Regions:
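Eukaryotic intrinsically disordered and solvent-exposed regulatory patches
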Residues: 23-25, 34-37, 60-61, 92-93, ...
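Conserved beta-strand segments of the P-loop GTPase G domain that flank and frequently precede/overlap
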Residues: 50-51, 74-78, 105-109
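Switch II (G3) loop of P-loop NTPases
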Residues: 45-60
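Conserved P-loop small GTPase signature centered on TRAFAC-class small GTPases
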Residues: 1-11, 15-18, 40-45, 86, ...
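Inter-motif core of Ras-like GTPase G domains
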Residues: 59-81, 88, 94-98
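The beta1-alpha1 cofactor-binding region of Rossmann-like NAD(H)/NADP(H)-dependent oxidoreductases
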Residues: 53-56, 82, 143
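WD40-repeat beta-propellers
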Residues: 49-51, 84, 91
Length: 179
């Protein structure tokens, strides 16, 4: 599940990962979006289900439905917006309270506008280590850093390396939970 404040670039990151596309003309996500992405790990193809949650306050009550059974949460912030970075702590707490086994990756978006940076890599790395997470810095606009961050996250957190089996499991409602 992708989580983060409004306008940090969650949907743009997903579009770059899945379609290798970016549009400056993007409308905010309403409610939640759904995508599938196939990731190759150890010569196996893993199907991930990606839930793109809206960051607007009026939709925040919907998010727990999607991270309750998630295997992983991708917490996105805007490196040019310090407030969006400080909110990552609340996102991690909310997910951890509902789903203690959920794994995290912290993603700083908008690396293409370095001159407007408000959050240092060192600060983001430090916070990610507090969550036992990895930190990735990307630009959905240019594609910088996009090549490996989801594959690394899936490899590190969602694949049982001893048996090389998917950890994505069916919940009681028959739907799979994932990113």
């Amino acid at each position: 599940v992708f989580l983060g404040d409004m306008a940090v670039g969650k949907t743009s990151i997903i579009n770059r990962c899945i379609r290798n596309a970016f549009s400056d003309l993007h409308t905010p996500t309403v409610g939640v979006g759904y995508e599938q992405m196939y990731v190759k790990v150890n010569e196996k193809t893993i199907r991930t289900e990606i839930w793109d949650t809206a960051g607007q306050e009026k939709y925040l009550s919907l998010a727990p439905m999607y991270y309750k059974n998630a295997q992983g949460a991708i917490i996105v912030f805007d490196i040019t917006n310090y407030h969006s970075f400080t909110r990552t702590k609340q996102w991690v707490k909310q997910v951890s309270d509902e789903n203690p086994s959920c794994k995290f990756i912290l993603v700083g978006n908008k690396a293409d506008i370095e001159q407007q940076r408000e959050v240092t890599k060192q600060l983001a790395d430090k916070l990610a280590s507090e969550y036992n997470a990895i930190y990735a810095e990307v630009s959905a606009k240019t594609g910088e850093g996009m090549d490996n961050f989801i594959q690394n996250f899936v490899t590190r957190n969602l694949v049982d390396t001893e048996t090389n089996k998917k950890l994505i499991s069916f919940g009681s409602n028959g739907r799979k939970g994932c990113c």
